[in-house]
């Protein structure tokens, strides 16, 4: 099956099937309500700077799609809304457009619609191992990217019938990429989370930030369950549907090692606020914006505003004048997340 066909299959499955794994760990985080906030809601400053780009509030639309003619309009709507809102976004894996240059416009449309926004390129670690720095450079140049995400999607590859399963010398190759590429490198999981031990390895390799891509949002093991035809592969995919570290577990594990992007089941501005309070620099989500973009750019704008309003409300009700104060907020942690923190010391 061509990479392009696989991409549109993934997109349709995400839109039409139940592909979320549920528990993110953010359910175990409570922001402590301040009955007298002593701040003016209208003066709250949500702006941050990320890799030299100002964002109106700490949100990225996560890597999602591209690489098929049907995805061009989706990326155009996302880019348009991101530019207007003053936030950032990532494109989906650019492998298909590198293999077939006729598909490049499904990605380049993002930069056309968002000339000033923070936009990051995206390519898979299996392809980087196979082809080296050259493929990363091409991904960056294709969209004039401000950064590049190298996605670590080995759970998906293990379930996928045509999966790339060689991870040998991955760290060595990643070190070479970080030395050579002219933009910051983000190491990005795609639904199974990143542990402290791996975060330390990634820092030593020269990675600039981590997108934890934790469990709790879209499960690509689940996505592959809907694609595979043989019963053994389907059964294995079901077994690993809930595999990985929940998003909040990864955030607390990786904080302080590298800047953390919180992705994996964030569905509101409150989720973004909780993520920042426990150690993330900013939040990110894909599925809510994908569903909105299928309808219109206006729906994407509404979803962005929903996240922005929720974040600002959480900041107001906890007495935070800016995002730095949110980072220093004391929170109540319970349940499995508390057990994880105790276990990890």
Curated annotation (Swiss-Prot):
Cofactor(s) the record lists: FMN; NADPH; Mg(2+)
A Gene Ontology term for the protein's cellular component: cytoplasm
Ligand binding (substrate): 6-7, 93-95, 156
Gene Ontology terms describing biological process: isoprenoid biosynthetic process
Binding of FMN, residues: 63-65, 93, 122, 188, 218, 265-267, 286-287
GO molecular function: FMN binding; isopentenyl-diphosphate delta-isomerase activity; magnesium ion binding; NADPH binding; oxidoreductase activity
EC number: 5.3.3.2
InterPro entries membership: Aldolase_TIM, FMN-dep_DH, IPdP_isomerase
Keywords: Cytoplasm, Flavoprotein, FMN, Isomerase, Isoprene biosynthesis, Magnesium, Metal-binding, NADP
Localization annotation: Cytoplasm
Enzyme class: isomerase
Protein role: Involved in the biosynthesis of isoprenoids. Catalyzes the 1,3-allylic rearrangement of the homoallylic substrate isopentenyl (IPP) to its allylic isomer, dimethylallyl diphosphate (DMAPP).
Subunit structure: Homooctamer. Dimer of tetramers.
Protein name according to UniProt: Isopentenyl-diphosphate delta-isomerase
Organism: Archaeoglobus fulgidus (strain ATCC 49558 / DSM 4304 / JCM 9628 / NBRC 100126 / VC-16)
């Amino acid at each position: 099956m061509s990479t392009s066909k696989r991409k549109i299959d993934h997109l349709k499955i995400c839109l039409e099937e139940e592909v979320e794994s549920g528990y993110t760990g953010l359910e175990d985080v409570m922001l402590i309500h301040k009955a007298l906030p002593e701040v003016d809601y209208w003066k709250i400053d949500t702006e941050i700077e990320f890799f030299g780009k100002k964002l109106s509030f700490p949100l990225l639309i996560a890597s999602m799609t591209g690489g098929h003619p049907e995805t061009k309009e989706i990326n155009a709507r996302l880019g348009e809304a991101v530019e207007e809102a003053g936030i950032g976004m990532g494109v989906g894996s650019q492998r298909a457009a590198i293999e077939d240059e006729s598909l490049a416009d499904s990605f380049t449309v993002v930069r056309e619609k968002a000339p000033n926004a923070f936009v990051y390129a995206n390519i898979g670690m299996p392809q980087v191992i196979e082809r080296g720095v050259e493929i990363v450079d091409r991904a960056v140049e294709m969209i004039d990217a401000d950064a590049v995400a190298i996605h670590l999607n080995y759970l998906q590859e293990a379930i996928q019938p045509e999966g790339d399963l060689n991870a040998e010398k991955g760290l060595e190759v990643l070190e070479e990429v970080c030395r050579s590429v002219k933009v910051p490198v983000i190491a990005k999981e795609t639904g199974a989370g990143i542990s402290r031990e791996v975060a330390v390895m990634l820092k030593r390799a020269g990675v600039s930030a981590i997108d934890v891509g934790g469990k709790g949002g879209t499960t690509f093991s689940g996505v592959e369950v809907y694609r595979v035809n043989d019963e053994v592969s389907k059964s294995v995919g079901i077994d690993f549907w809930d595999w990985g570290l929940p998003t909040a577990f990864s955030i607390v594990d990786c904080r302080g090692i590298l800047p953390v992007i919180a992705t994996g089941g964030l569905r509101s501005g409150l989720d973004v606020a909780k993520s920042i309070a426990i150690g993330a620099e900013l939040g990110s989500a894909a599925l809510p914006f994908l569903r909105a973009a299928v309808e219109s750019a206006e729906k994407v704008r509404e979803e962005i505003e929903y996240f922005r309003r929720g974040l600002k409300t959480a900041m107001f009700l906890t007495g935070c004048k800016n995002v730095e104060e949110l980072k220093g907020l004391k929170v109540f942690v319970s349940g499995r997340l508390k057990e994880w923190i105790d276990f990890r010391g």
